A protein has these predicted regions:
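Sec-dependent N-terminal signal peptides of Gram-positive bacterial secreted proteins and lipoproteins
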Residues: 4-19
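Sec/Tat signal peptide C-region and signal peptidase I cleavage site
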Residues: 19-25
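Active-site beta->alpha N-cap acidic-glycine motif
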Residues: 25-104, 114-122, 128-129
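C-terminal domain-boundary segment and adjacent tail
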Residues: 28-32, 59-61, 71-74, 199-224
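A cross-family glycoside hydrolase active-site/sugar-binding cleft signature
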Residues: 40, 65-69, 91-93, 133-135, ...
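Catalytic domains of cell-wall/extracellular-matrix polysaccharide-remodeling enzymes
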Residues: 52, 97-193, 197-215, 219-220
Length: 224
């Protein structure tokens, strides 16, 4: 019996330790010979963070993709409108960001997505985008839930580099910059995860340095 338990652990432990720090992502639309990076921001819009992110992006002439929380659009319609009018891509993230409510069933996931879509369309009637990001990423999401997203004609997009700002809320801007570099590695096509939720001051502070670094390395900034 002891040998059987040991053998089982030897099979399971490698699978647990090999879980990636960042999720896989399809390469952005780009010439395969050209290095590219897509900046993506989850969990906005917010009053405290999103406008500062937009100011920096405008100053640097860089476009980004914002994965929106639908319930946060109310009272922040002008921020969402600004994202759209300044040429950024607005995509569906979630309405509530409450994992238990979202992932209970195919119907609860579908309802959450539709509510988010409705909140965006109420502000931007001409908006159209087929991108979706699972709250927490698609790692470990049940197959039937992934299929629900496909049936809704949406493309689920994860990431392959991250500032780790959501899991390290006390990190300094320099530390977030280090996380970005270590997770991006030498990838030719990068989809970078950051957040514009409440309290992401260090993300705002790190963003100019992140943009400068990848620009100097010859990366082209693209929308998803």
């Amino acid at each position: 019996m002891r040998k059987l338990v040991l053998f089982t652990l030897l099979l399971i432990l490698p699978a647990l330790t090999m879980r990636p720090l960042t999720q896989t992502a399809a390469a952005p639309h780009s010439d395969l010979e050209e290095k590219s990076i897509c900046l993506t921001f989850d969990d906005g819009p917010t009053d405290s963070t999103t406008p500062h992110i937009l100011d920096i992006l405008k100053s640097e002439n860089v476009k980004a993709t914002f994965f929106v929380i639908g319930k946060q659009v109310r009272s922040r319609e002008e921020i969402l409108r600004r994202e759209y009018e300044e040429g950024h891509r607005i995509a569906i993230h979630t309405y509530s960001h409450e994992y238990k409510a979202i992932y209970t069933s195919e119907e609860t996931l579908r309802s959450d997505i539709l509510q988010c879509r409705k909140a965006i369309l109420k502000v931007l009637p001409a908006w159209n985008c087929d991108l979706y990001r699972f709250p927490g990423g698609s790692w470990g999401i049940r197959d039937e839930l992934k299929e629900t997203v496909k049936k809704m004609k949406l493309r689920a997009v994860d990431w392959n580099a991250s500032a780790e700002d959501a899991v390290n809320p006390a990190a300094t801007a320099d530390k977030l910059f280090d996380y970005v570099l270590s997770s991006a590695g030498n990838r030719k096509h990068i989809v970078l995860l950051m957040h514009d939720g409440v309290g992401y001051k260090a993300t705002v502070q790190a963003l100019p340095k992140i943009i400068q670094y990848f620009r100097e390395k010859g990366y082209k900034f693209q929308l998803l």
